[in-house]
A protein has these predicted regions:
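Sec-dependent N-terminal signal peptides
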Residues: 8-17
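Bacterial N-terminal signal peptides that target proteins for export
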Residues: 1-9
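Beta-strand-enriched cores of mature, soluble protein domains
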Residues: 24-168
Length: 168
C-alpha cells in the first residue's frame, strides 16, 4: 500500500509539473538590422562611450513580421561592454507596435546576451506589456543579427497570433 501511495504521489507530481509548463509558449523573434554610430567619446585610455541606433526588420514564429529601431548607449572597456541600455520600437505588419527596453552587461562588443522587456504597446497589444525576453546578438561589420526568446502566456500568444490574422 505504501509503495502504491508513493507511486501515486510521483505520478501526480509529474502531471502537476507538466501541466505547469503547458501554459508557457516560446515566442521567438529573429531580427536583422544595421548599426549607425551617432556619437563616440573617449572616456579614458581604455574606456569609450558610444551612442548608436539600429534599424531593421523582424519575423517571429507566429507568422508576424515588421520593422524595428533602437537607440542605445554603451560604455566599452577594451572593446568589452561594461553597460548597454537602449529603448526601441517594433512595428508589426498591421501597424500595431510595442516599445521595449534592452540591457546588456559585461560582454564583448561584437556578440552577447541580454534582456528585453516590453514597456509600452498600442491598444491591441497591451496584454504583452511586461513580457520579458532573452536575446543573443552577433555583429558582422555594422550588421546586427538577433534572436530573441520569450516565455509567454496563452493570452499573450493569442494576442500576438491575432496580428497575422488581421488585414493589413
Amino acid at each position: 500500500m505504501e509503495v502504491k501511495l508513493k507511486q501515486l504521489i510521483v505520478i501526480l507530481l509529474i502531471i502537476f509539473v507538466s501541466c505547469g509548463n503547458v501554459s508557457a509558449f516560446d515566442y521567438i523573434m529573429e531580427l536583422h538590422g544595421k548599426r549607425e554610430i551617432i556619437k563616440s567619446y573617449p572616456l579614458s585610455k581604455d574606456k569609450r562611450y558610444l551612442n548608436f541606433i539600429l534599424e531593421g526588420t523582424f519575423t517571429d514564429n507566429l507568422g508576424n513580421y515588421g520593422v524595428w529601431d533602437v537607440s542605445s548607449i554603451v560604455t566599452l572597456q577594451n572593446k568589452n561592454v561594461i553597460n548597454l541600455q537602449g529603448y526601441g520600437k517594433s512595428t508589426y505588419q498591421n501597424n500595431e507596435f510595442i516599445y521595449v527596453k534592452g540591457i546588456r552587461n559585461k560582454q564583448e562588443q561584437q556578440a552577447g546576451v541580454g534582456k528585453v522587456e516590453v514597456v509600452n504597446a498600442s491598444k491591441s497589444l497591451l496584454a504583452i506589456i511586461g513580457m520579458s525576453c532573452t536575446y543573443a546578438v552577433n555583429f558582422y561589420e555594422e550588421n546586427a543579427y538577433f534572436i530573441q526568446k520569450c516565455k509567454i502566456t496563452e493570452k499573450q500568444k493569442e494576442v500576438l497570433s491575432n496580428i497575422s490574422k488581421k488585414k493589413e
